């Protein structure tokens, strides 16, 4: 796996799924291929994206700044600086300075990532802030190692939280999760259907699922009732995906 592929993988792991994720993936690919060379326009686009957390925007802004060639005097962006200040916690800043001193002696991506993984996400973000604000300088490889370590810390905590939701025994949460998954899968099918021969069938299955979810939410149902919806939709999807040759996300 090349260095830039690895960076793209880690950064995208902290971006919520949806159309915006696909858009960000495309921007990263363009930036890494040297196609997107206007940093100002790119940063303005990033600043106005909805859904993304300030920290995710800060990390993406840091990656874009590292990768896109720019004028030396180009102003640093406030939204990136604010995101990479470690929540203003002096403890994070102290640790960031210690980490920076270690990284300064490092020259490889993997070496930097290994060192950085022993620090908290707050300290890692503060260290990125030091480099972003030109208070310290490291090689691009080392900076990317720092980025990937930060994303790994964030993705780990997101995964723990997601696993808790998926394995919860609370029937109300499981019920709502099934309905949300049914709705998002229906939406994905409608988007995919545009160019396929089976478009009418896909739209029909998606529409039925959507109506069922709407009815359940309106009249209220027993938390176990959505299990049937999940099974029916899954059966329809599996038949559809065999013909389409597409692997759909499985329901939990």
Curated annotation (Swiss-Prot):
Record localization: Virion membrane; Host nucleus
GO molecular function: RNA binding; structural constituent of virion
GO biological process, one term: viral budding from plasma membrane
UniProt region (Membrane-binding), positions on chain: 1-164
Subunit composition and interactions: Homodimer and homomultimer. Interacts with NEP. Binds ribonucleocapsid by both interacting with genomic RNA and NP protein. May interact with HA and NA. Cannot bind NP without genomic RNA.
Annotated function: Plays critical roles in virus replication, from virus entry and uncoating to assembly and budding of the virus particle. M1 binding to ribonucleocapsids (RNPs) in nucleus seems to inhibit viral transcription. Interaction of viral NEP with M1-RNP is thought to promote nuclear export of the complex, which is targeted to the virion assembly site at the apical plasma membrane in polarized epithelial cells. Interactions with NA and HA may bring M1, a non-raft-associated protein, into lipid rafts. Forms a continuous shell on the inner side of the lipid bilayer in virion, where it binds the RNP.
More about this protein: Most abundant protein in virion. When expressed alone can form virus-like particles in transfected cells.
Name listed for the protein in its UniProt record: Matrix protein 1
Gene that specifies this protein: M
